[in-house]
Amino acid sequence: MEEIQRYLQLKRSQQHNFLYPLIFQEYIYAFAHDRIFSRSFLSENTGYENKSSLLIVKRLITRMYQQNPFIIFPNDSTQNQFLGHNKNFYSQLISEGFAFIVEIPFFLRLISSLEGKKKKIVKSQNLRSIHSIFPFLEDSFSHLNFVLDILIPQPVHAEILVQTLRYWVKDASSLHLIRFLLNEYCNWNSLIFPKKASSSFSNSKRNQRNQRLFLFLYNSHVCEYESIFFFLRNQSSHLRSTYSRVLLERIYFYGKIEHLVNVVVKVKDFQANLWLVKEPCMHYVRYQRKSLLASKGTSLFMNKWKCFLVTFWQWHFALWFHPRRIYINQLSKNLLEFLGYLSSVQMNPSVVRSQILENSFLINNAIKKFDTLVPIIPLIASLANTKFCNVLGHPISKPVWADLSDSHIIDRFGRICSNLSHYHSGSSKKKSLYRIKYILRLSCARTLARKHKSTVRAFLKRLGSELLEEFLMSEEDVLFLTFPKASSTLRGVYKSRIWYLDILCISDLVNYK
């Protein structure tokens, strides 16, 4: 990255389009593939298993210099050919390198904005964890009333992504290449948002290789969505956003806001009508396609926000945004499904005895508490889709794992069980997890019994039930094995919700949507 940064500093004053020449540099592909060219990705092309991957990259760069790079061979069985070989292979190769290249200006911008803040960066490493969101929700959402449950729409056409990226990357050649790569993948919509767990996105190696480029394009698209929140926050509050300068550094943005005043609000003075969406206590959270906008305001206020966002997105992105994609939920009455949890704000009653002189009386207080539960029904449905149980939740064997050794089978089931228990450690009611552990335990036993052509009862009787006890260990047991000197009085604390700061992604079983 330092070599690329020096290259950009030298070339920035010489030419404006500084991204496109990096595509012709071999070391870019080394960076993109962690300097390892011998991975299966670079050697899966038919007829080139024994060739050096570096030669493939050199041949690709040489042919990109030619005037007519799109060579079609009619005698080949593949209908679409690109650069003399399979079109998908070289498109994947270019997209991997280009995905690394197009992230460089954003990386340099981030580094420049964080200079002199290294101590803050070290302290904020734990914020990378998904579980770091929930302590924020506990502190903030318990005092709020309504929340907008927003499903961010995906763009209906690839050109929308290119136009969005045009405000970030001032490089016409790179934008043309992005447009070409998107046109190469006609089913790019399903690559970003798979509708089913068995879709090509989750199983196909080709789609996994291009995931980085597509996710980068989609994230730039989402940043465009979120820009309106930063703008309204800075206009309607004295508290300025510290990251808005980096996020909103795009051409024509404030020109769009001026048109937004005339088209959406239909008034001349935008500042005088910010009361429509002005709220000093608003919180915004997003993960993947789902975002939450919580407020202390009334239902009428949230309806104004809903109409404002729908109209803004439809006009700004020229696509149809259905109002039903935004749900208005009252936190005290509705369950909020977010990040594999069912969340709500519950009233926790408490009684306080007070005594003044000879008179004593009771004071009933109701304290709002942010509650998180495990969605047991969707989780069982996810286990049924992966063939650990049937649709009713009855455990079944896993035939595809029957050829593995006993230790590998137990290790796989134990890893799944511990990951689910680890992720759902923040649930206020742990009884739902016991059913999931029971399904996985019995599924493991039936898989082992199927392998040894025996019954579950006979297998457990012969080897002992302790064989499956290891991966059924609870989180609090793991903590007390790690800290054996912990007092027994703390066991009640550990039985409550635990948020871990080492969870960087959601398991496929949890991400059942």
From Swiss-Prot:
Subcellular location: Plastid, Chloroplast
GO biological process, one term: RNA splicing
Keywords on record: Chloroplast, mRNA processing, Plastid, RNA-binding, tRNA processing
Domain of life: Eukaryota
Family, similarity comment: Belongs to the intron maturase 2 family. MatK subfamily.
Function (record text): Usually encoded in the trnK tRNA gene intron. Probably assists in splicing its own and other chloroplast group II introns.
Protein name: Maturase K
Organism of derivation: Keckiella cordifolia
Gene: matK
